[in-house]
Amino acid sequence: MIKLNQIVKRYHTKDKDVLAVDHVDLNIESGSIFGVIGFSGAGKSTLIRMFNNLESPTSGEIIIDGDNISQLSKSQLRKKRQKVSMIFQHFNLLWSRSVLKNVTFPLEIAGVPSGLAKQKALELIELVGLKGRESAYPSELSGGQKQRVGIARALANDPDVLLCDEATSALDPQTTDEILDLLLKVREQQNLTIVLITHEMHVIRRICDEVAVMENGKVIEQGAVSKVFENPQHEVTKRFVKDDLNDDFEDSLEYLEPLDHDAYIVRLNFTGENTTEPIISYMTTTHNIDVNILEADIKNTKNGSFGFLVIHIPHISEEHFKQFKHNLHEQHVNVEVLKHG
């Protein structure tokens, strides 16, 4: 279990004080994958660097498995960092060392005998899919391969927690998915708790159990990923979800021809089993209305599916529309009016 209690981080500059992290509270369950998302400057990188005391909080407590990180002595902190490991956006590999030597490096620092260190490193290199590349140097590797080395190195001391600081931001979409799949694999095999920060909602949706959304140093929204996608509350969260769904229809509403007085354009939002229900068939048969499909998409999270459907209803009375909306609501389909004639 990881607990953050009222974490504050201030930077003092010549001209002013900067509040980078503003009274953040988080509870992260052991064995879960917890994501923190925010735009640049939101405070997420500063926050994650306080988990292993690369940055010290100005005030507040970070407790990992019962240890208050800020109160550990230097020797205790060094030992704790072996159990709270980290991977980085730009890999931070040692360019003069081979893949094998990069992975053995933290074991050398920990005083592990060279034979055991080599054996452990070879096992980890195979785990991350780089068997046969032990003698290669970082300059000979692709971005995805470099991050695989970073993951293997981070696992060398059998950590309980893996911190991921924008670990996929420098990668192309396909390689990103491969690294995310690898993180899921090592989480299961190593029984890890993973905390990752990102500005990509796709990353959150694909592997996280819970998410916290940050803006201006504050956590503005938090919850299970499926619930946050289903019903985002804050405008920043709505923007992330909208971008992930490629839902840009509202931006084009003003360019549509004027609607008839009894016409509607609505968005239907649905989750879980509703994503496979014949909603269009229900509308046409039960309510005897014509619909035009303008836009649609479905996405999957670890805990279920969610999606939306934008439709144009050319003719429907106000009373009929109220009944239609009520009936869909009973089926757990949210109806949002985007435009009305």
Curated annotation (Swiss-Prot):
Which subcellular locations apply to this protein? Cell membrane
Residues covered by the ABC transporter domain = 2-241
Q: Which UniProt keywords apply?
A: Amino-acid transport, ATP-binding, Cell membrane, Membrane, Nucleotide-binding, Translocase, Transport
User: InterPro entries, from UniProt?
Assistant: AAA+_ATPase (IPR003593), ABC_transporter-like_ATP-bd (IPR003439), ABC_transporter-like_CS (IPR017871), ACT-like_dom_sf (IPR045865), MetN_ABC (IPR041701), MetN_ABC_transporter-like (IPR050086), NIL_domain (IPR018449), P-loop_NTPase (IPR027417)
**Catalyses which reaction?**
L-methionine(out) + ATP + H2O = L-methionine(in) + ADP + phosphate + H(+); D-methionine(out) + ATP + H2O = D-methionine(in) + ADP + phosphate + H(+)
Question: Which CDD domains does the record match to this protein?
Answer: ABC_MetN_methionine_transporter
Record SMART domains: AAA, NIL
Q: Where does ATP bind?
A: G38, F39, S40, G41, A42, G43, K44, S45
- What PROSITE patterns does the annotation carry? ABC_TRANSPORTER_1, ABC_TRANSPORTER_2, METN
Which Gene3D superfamilies has this protein been placed in? Answer: 3.30.70.260, P-loop containing nucleotide triphosphate hydrolases
Any Gene Ontology CC annotation: plasma membrane
MF (Gene Ontology): ABC-type D-methionine transporter activity; ATP binding; ATP hydrolysis activity
Family, according to the entry, reads as follows: Belongs to the ABC transporter superfamily. Methionine importer (TC 3.A.1.24) family.
Protein role: Part of the ABC transporter complex MetNIQ involved in methionine import. Responsible for energy coupling to the transport system.
Oligomeric form and interacting partners: The complex is composed of two ATP-binding proteins (MetN), two transmembrane proteins (MetI) and a solute-binding protein (MetQ).
Protein's name in the database: Methionine import ATP-binding protein MetN 2
